[in-house]
């Protein structure tokens, strides 16, 4: 209940109430992580929907090139910035099915200057935000969800199709990360910078990153992390990889001028740690305007500040008036057009 109060008061900008919660019991250690644990049971169905929708019959959609950028998954050329190194969670978050660059009909954006990325490199097949080009038959080539959090495959350069029996996976025994201890640390770091709560935002951010890394890296279980062809090469993230990443983020934080710039870094790291949870990033984006996301390739209208009611509800209940995408929820007091 205290962590729910933290979430609510962060949304409403109530720093005093958050200060009162600092001495209370909140989700701040990994053994308290609030998550739903999926299993391999089929009666009743309990397999992760991320696995179910992307592994048995090939992946069901395109990953975001912008998210690849946040993880520094590509070829380390501009506009790849942030830490300057691959995120240690990369091979746990994402799985590549093909050791081949997309081209021809598989890359309809090639040569179009309207795209920020089109293709990021390193065999990460995704799409830019808002790309509505035709869809080729590439569902067994696109990059998809890895072992975390959906219980898929660890990317050890095997490049097997996800629907192949030769692809070792956790068979969908993943989790739904509803609210993790790492999230709490990022939330408090945000409160320190944005609401004046008396906490060490830098230290909290570092702790949040560490908690996220530990959870993700532990997730591969018995899956092999060594190279498919050379077992002397191990792609598992090491403590040195994690320490290097955190040190680079902290150096970036120290160099940032003012709380607003520091807040942007905190939110970016929370965003990266939220993989598998769309609710917290949606709230933080409406609350802070961060992280800075890729502009859509084509105009898509105003950013949805709230969700519309489902048609099943409005059709069956004449007392429900359909809302509009730009309608703001009660705690969203930022100006109209705050997010474009």
Segments the model singles out, each with a brief description of its role:
Residues 1-220, 259-261, 269:
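Structured, solvent-exposed acidic/aromatic patches
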């Amino acid at each position: 209940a205290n962590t729910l109060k933290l979430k609510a008061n962060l949304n409403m900008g109530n720093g005093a109430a958050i200060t009162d919660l600092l001495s209370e019991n909140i989700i701040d250690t990994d053994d308290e992580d609030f998550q739903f644990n999926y299993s391999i049971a089929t009666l009743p169905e309990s397999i992760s929907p991320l696995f179910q929708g992307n592994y048995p019959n090939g992946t069901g959609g395109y990953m975001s090139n912008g998210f690849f950028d946040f993880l520094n998954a590509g070829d380390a050329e501009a506009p790849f910035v942030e830490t300057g190194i691959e995120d240690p969670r990369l091979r746990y978050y994402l799985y590549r099915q093909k050791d081949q660059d997309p081209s021809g009909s598989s890359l309809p954006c090639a040569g179009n200057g309207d795209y920020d990325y089109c293709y990021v490199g390193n065999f990460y097949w995704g799409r830019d935000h808002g790309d509505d080009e035709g869809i080729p038959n590439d569902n067994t080539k696109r990059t998809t969800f890895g072992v975390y959090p959906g219980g898929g495959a660890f990317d050890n350069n095997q490049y097997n199709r996800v629907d192949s029996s030769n692809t070792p996976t956790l068979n969908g025994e993943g989790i739904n990360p509803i609210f993790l201890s790492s999230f709490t640390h990022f939330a408090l770091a945000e409160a320190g910078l944005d609401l004046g709560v008396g906490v060490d935002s830098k230290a909290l951010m570092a702790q949040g990153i560490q908690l996220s890394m530990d959870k993700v890296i532990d997730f591969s279980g018995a899956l092999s992390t060594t190279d498919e062809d050379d077992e002397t090469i191990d792609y598992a993230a090491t403590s040195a990889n994690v320490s290097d990443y955190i040190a680079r983020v902290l150096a970036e934080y120290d160099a940032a001028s003012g709380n607003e710039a520091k807040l942007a870094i905190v939110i970016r790291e929370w965003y990266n740690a939220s993989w598998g949870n769309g609710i917290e990033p949606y709230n933080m984006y409406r609350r802070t305007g961060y992280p800075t996301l890729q502009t859509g390739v084509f105009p898509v209208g105003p950013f949805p500040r709230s969700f519309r009611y489902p048609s099943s509800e409005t059709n069956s209940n004449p007392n429900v008036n359909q809302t509009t995408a730009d309608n703001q929820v009660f705690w969203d007091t930022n100006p109209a057009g705050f997010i474009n």
